[in-house]
């Protein structure tokens, strides 16, 4: 259901895929790339799943429960940088100021935030704001980050 909804309204992503293809930066059919991308964005996960994904990133790419490396350590800072600068789409800058943590939102209302070297915070709430980010999940994570003093910017930076 999420896939169908996202795919039928993916006008912006469809345009980007076509531009990338036109510029020689997308090496497959733009519509097929859009289908694959949208399908990956529509995978259902729980708050526990998000928390474990974030904890794995906080642990340098090693799953903290299994001890198994699931991502090369050298890629973790790159991924966290992308999360910090683009994880909230148009609200990424505001998010970084308010929460001060790299994070990624999902269309289902999930958000995962990472405190590198320490832990992750995950939350789910379906009500989205105009930018497509969960209102309650954002507030919960901002409050937790402030209470723990883990944000790197804003009024509660340590």
For each of these PLM feature ranges, what is it?
Residues 1-41:
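Active-site-adjacent helix/loop patches that line small-molecule binding or acyl-intermediate pockets
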Residues 11, 15, 32, 45-48, ...:
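Conserved active-site and cofactor/substrate-binding residues in soluble primary-metabolism enzymes
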Residues 38-39, 44-46, 102:
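Generic, ordered loop/turn and secondary-structure boundary motif
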Residues 56-158:
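Structured C-terminal helix/loop/strand segments within mature extracytoplasmic catalytic/sensor domains
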């Amino acid at each position: 259901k999420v896939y169908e909804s996202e795919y039928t309204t993916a006008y912006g992503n469809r345009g980007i895929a076509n531009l990338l293809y036109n510029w020689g930066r997308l090496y497959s059919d733009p519509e097929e790339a859009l289908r694959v991308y949208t399908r990956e964005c529509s995978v259902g996960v729980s708050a526990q799943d998000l928390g474990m994904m974030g904890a794995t990133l906080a642990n340098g790419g090693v799953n903290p429960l299994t001890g198994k490396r699931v991502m090369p350590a050298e890629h973790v800072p790159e991924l966290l940088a992308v999360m910090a600068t683009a994880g909230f789409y148009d609200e990424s800058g505001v998010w970084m100021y308010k929460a001060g943590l790299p994070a990624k939102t999902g269309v289902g209302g999930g958000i995962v935030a990472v405190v590198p070297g320490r832990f992750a915070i995950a939350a789910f709430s379906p009500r989205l704001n105009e930018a497509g980010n969960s209102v309650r999940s954002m507030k919960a994570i901002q409050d937790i980050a402030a209470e723990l003093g883990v944000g790197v910017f804003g009024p509660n930076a340590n």
